[in-house]
Regions:
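NAD(P)+-binding Rossmann beta1-loop-alpha1 motif at the extreme N-terminus of oxidoreductases
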Residues: 1-61, 128-129
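Phosphate- and divalent-cation-binding pockets in alpha/beta enzyme and binding domains
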Residues: 16, 43, 77-78, 104, ...
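Short-chain dehydrogenase/reductase
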Residues: 18, 79, 184
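Rossmann-like NAD(P)(H) cofactor-binding subdomain of soluble oxidoreductases
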Residues: 48, 56-133
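Internal alpha-helical scaffold of NAD(P)-dependent oxidoreductase catalytic cores
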Residues: 104, 108-114, 130-168, 179-191
Length: 191
């Protein structure tokens, strides 16, 4: 992959995606990470052997693709900080935040952007996940390929034509594995 990726947020899911990309041989100079929580930055940098900073704009300027891995409740504020840069650079926007629509993201970043929503699930942390992907009308085939390449590093990928179905993907794929793990733990405890 020759695309530079800006990870806005360095939580568990971002770590799993980055880890999968590194295992696939992606050049770490193409990966840029911003993490606001200071105590997390050194551990994240050591774990991934990457530079991790506290500057979303700096990271965004380095990426052709911006992968938003922040909590939904802070997404609007993060987008406001990056709106001017988004309009100047027109990157491919990818979000793994549940409940935030492609239209909302596009609006918050100033409009006219290619946006992909992805709903990964917890097995992605082990490279065995299932990802539902939705692209708005501005995402071209090349950008779809980039998004799919990114998430194949964590597991299977399926494109969804209707964004309304992302809620179903979130409910089943996002939460389903947790229920299966809970059932397995209960069966193990009962044995």
């Amino acid at each position: 992959m020759n695309t530079s990726i800006a990870f806005i947020g360095g939580g568990n899911m971002a770590r799993s995606i980055i880890g999968g990309l590194l295992k696939q041989g992606v050049d770490k100079s193409r990966l840029h990470v911003s993490e606001p929580y200071e105590p997390t930055r050194p551990a994240l940098a050591d774990e991934l052997s990457l530079q991790v900073v506290n500057d979303n704009v700096q990271v965004a300027l380095a990426g052709q693709v911006w992968l938003f891995a922040v909590k939904p409740q802070v997404m609007k504020a993060v987008c406001a900080e990056l709106k001017e840069t988004a309009q100047a650079n027109k990157p491919l926007i990818i979000s793994i935040a549940a409940g935030i629509t492609a239209t909302q993201l596009d609006d918050w970043l100033g409009g006219g952007l290619p946006v992909v929503r992805v709903m990964p699930n917890t097995p992605a942390l082990l490279g065995a996940g299932a990802n539902g992907l939705y692209a708005n009308e501005r995402v071209d085939d090349g950008q779809k390929h980039i998004a799919e390449q990114l998430f194949r590093a964590t597991g299977l990928c399926t494109w969804i034509a209707d964004e309304a179905l992302m809620n179903t993907v979130t409910a089943l794929s996002g939460s389903g594995p947790a229920y299966v793990f809970l059932l397995c733990e209960a069966m193990q405890a009962a044995a």
